[in-house]
Regions:
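FIC/Doc superfamily catalytic core
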Residues: 1-119
Length: 119
């Protein structure tokens, strides 16, 4: 019953990671050894930032996906955090279907993420 389950559930990834679209790697994540520091730094930034919540949520989402801290579920977790950040600012955002929007425009989403890595 446990066959195929990820061994790293509940902790940061221990190996390399990346984002793949089809057969194309669009992002290689930072080394696993750097993940705890990077995640801590990201949450410290979120705690202390004066950026507008719309900007902060987007920066957080992008940086979280860039770090790619887990072996699986990074996209869902990043979008969940973005929704949380926005809904703490304006409760209406609790009902924003970010998952559906990303799924509908997944090709464009990955293209935009890939483009930002080139800048």
């Amino acid at each position: 019953m446990e066959a195929g389950l990820i061994d790293e559930i509940g902790c940061f990834r221990k190996g390399g990671a990346g984002v793949v679209s089809g057969k194309t790697v669009i992002h290689y994540a930072p080394d696993a050894e750097r993940v705890p520091f990077l995640v801590n730094d990201l949450f410290e930034w979120l705690r202390t930032t004066d950026e507008h919540p719309l900007i902060a949520s987007c920066v957080f989402h992008y940086e979280f996906e860039f770090i790619h801290p887990f072996a699986d579920g990074n996209g869902r977790t990043g979008r969940l955090w973005q929704t949380l950040i926005l809904s703490r600012w304006r409760p209406i955002f609790k009902n924003l279907p970010i998952e559906n929007i990303v799924y509908k425009y997944q090709k464009e989403y990955y293209k935009a993420v890939s483009y930002t890595h080139l800048r």
